[in-house]
Amino acid sequence: MAEFSDPPPSNLSSSHKLTKPNQTLDESSPTAPIRDLVTNSLSLSSPIRQIQALSPAKPDGSSSSPPDKTLNFNPEENRDVNPDESSSSPSDKTLIAPPAQISPVSNNNHLRITNTSDSYLYRPPRRYIEYESDDDELNKMEPTKPLQLSWWYPRIEPTGVGAGLYNSGNTCFIASVLQCFTHTVPLIDSLRSFMYGNPCNCGNEKFCVMQALRDHIELALRSSGYGINIDRFRDNLTYFSSDFMINHQEDAHEFLQSFLDKLERCCLDPKNQLGSVSSQDLNIVDNVFGGGLMSTLCCCNCNSVSNTFEPSLGWSLEIEDVNTLWKALESFTCVEKLEDQLTCDNCKEKVTKEKQLRFDKLPPVATFHLKRFTNDGVTMEKIFDHIEFPLELDLSPFMSSNHDPEVSTRYHLYAFVEHIGIRATFGHYSSYVRSAPETWHNFDDSKVTRISEERVLSRPAYILFYAREGTPWFSSTFEQLKTVFEATPLHFSPVSVLDNSYESVDNSSKACNDSVGVSIPDVKWPDSCCQEPKEEVFHSAESSNNEDSSAMIDALGSPQSEKPFAETSQQTEPESCPTENKAYIDKSEKPFAETSQPKEPKPFADRASIDAPLLKVQNQDISPKRKAGERATLGGPKLKYQKPNSHQKRQGTFQIQRAHLQTKKQEESRKTKRPLFRSNVAASAPDPKYKNHALSYLNRAQTPRARKLANALSDSPTKKKKSSNMRRSIKL
């Protein structure tokens, strides 16, 4: 076995020999070539390129160890040495390491091997090995900086637009339409100031489109920079249309029309409880998206003209053989001949008529649907042609003569929906929103990215949203709402707004537009709390900055306070929870001002008759010991206070058995038998046939309850089988 030791200082030798006094390598032996081959292979496979000296040699070149046991490496001399050459002494053979594999740093490097058994190639420890990389750039690379983790999640700055919407299974067509609604400023203003009855006229007690849209827009604006779920709309997809199927791709324009139809139904009140306001003023859908067309029919025989007004919530444009939105509008409003030989009301003859459509009423928000899908009754194909759409659109050339000249006809593009795919039922929908004149964002499900205007104009638009000139940009509206949101924190978690727990709260109140109300800021109430009349959780930012907390609560209670999404309808408290869950709090200890006067708690003596448990006991009787002391102080007869026996509450086994025997003895003396169970079970069967059948059935079971039932039904109690009988019956 080879032994390694640190080399002592020694002189360098130029013999390059591994000298051993007792062992030599005999070239004449049959194993000599194999030994040379193994030695060369080991040296060639070694990854060592440089070896540092374990200890430097002395300056004078002397060494305390014999030179015949030292292997010195010199690249200048090893380069000319042949391994086949032998030394001057035939008994001393030389083993030379290949210079291409081992090269010393200096001429003073040496390595000493002390061997007692056989020859061994020495591999120095790794701490004395230096590696040089051929690539200098790797040596200049800086080490990776460690991650700086904190105890809190990094703060995500708002993006200036609404939150992204998670795709929970083919919901991209819902998300794209909701993103356009979220960034429609006239719709946001209408939802904030709209008053609707309770319950609404949506036709569904479990789901209200109006309330769901208000909650979604509010949550999306509060969660800017994050992502939220839209499962509430997905789960109620069949409510919008019976043709829709959950987890299936549907057409975005069809969903848009169905959504506006259901939203308009929530706005209309058939009873017209607010008699001073007309139903047209209550319809926020018509106020935001409602437009109208003037259809003109001209008789080619007598030139008589008839005009018809056609209301609409958007317009669908044919895009075949056109490449711009302007040409599609020209094709939409051009004169069309009807060859159906219609009967003229004036000349009473079947004639050919000409029809022309013109815009008569322009809404604050105009939507244009580009018909990219054509259906021939068998197959549906998509038109992939790029349609150019302008950022600014003037509709004055397409207006009717009855149009009000004071109403502006200029519009600005602020959002649109695109479809990527070959069919309407396949592919993917995404939306683009223009929050400022030069700021565009792409909403691809939960991913929200900033995008350039040039890239926006090159996208294949499917539904275009134009806002009338003079409408505030979304960025300014978002800054105003952001100030209000910072002053009024959200009182419910983002997940609970759209999940099933929130829907269960709506179901409990039997009103689709109710939610859990709170009256104190920064207090989170559980979903299982009593359903109170909805208190609005928002107030104006001015009052929150200048008034104290009590004034903020008063502002919340007042209906005149400014709120982002105000509830102004009068609602009565539903009886959705028992009165035992209510509690009265002492008014003197409340830190905030109350908006309503609580009921006066009843005395403690009448506690059995009150409706709810008291949080603070009032008029409580003093203890008997204190009462006895007061009597002695006032000169009355001093009563001796006897401490109650604590063992009475925890009786032992003997006391329990004694009480049981006394009770049993009293019952026997009174000749009364206490029933072992309910009387309806213990009643005997009227028919003895059924009685015997019941006894035979009960005797099968070997449970205490079965034996009690059998004893009650029969005059003679049945005896319990012994264990031996049970074993015998089993063997049989």
From Swiss-Prot:
Compositional bias annotation for Basic and acidic residues: 583-609
Listed PROSITE patterns: USP_1, USP_2, USP_3
Keyword Protease: yes
Region (Disordered): 1-111, 534-732
UniProt cross-references to SUPFAM superfamilies, sorted A to Z: Cysteine proteinases (SSF54001)
Active site: C172 (nucleophile), H428 (proton acceptor)
Name used for this protein in its record: Ubiquitin carboxyl-terminal hydrolase 21
Organism: Arabidopsis thaliana (Mouse-ear cress)
Classification of source organism: Eukaryota, Viridiplantae, Streptophyta, Embryophyta, Tracheophyta
